């Protein structure tokens, strides 16, 4: 189910949205692309956290799984 989210952009928000708009795009398309970029940012942050946590792991000392 799709939910509607209310958003009242500031003047600066409007400038950013307008600058990011591609030909034929609506403002909602720009915001959707921005959300996808945020999703990627969250994924990268988690990947870095995982890499830091596993940095001392040496899988070469473990038996092969196959």
UniProtKB/Swiss-Prot annotation:
Top-level taxon: Bacteria
Keywords: Toxin-antitoxin system
Subunit structure and binding partners: Forms a complex with cognate toxin Rv3098A/RVBD_3098A.
Main function: Putative antitoxin component of a possible type II toxin-antitoxin (TA) system. May neutralize the effect of cognate toxin Rv3098A/RVBD_3098A.
Protein name: Putative antitoxin Rv3098B/RVBD_3098B
Species, as recorded: Mycobacterium tuberculosis (strain ATCC 25618 / H37Rv)
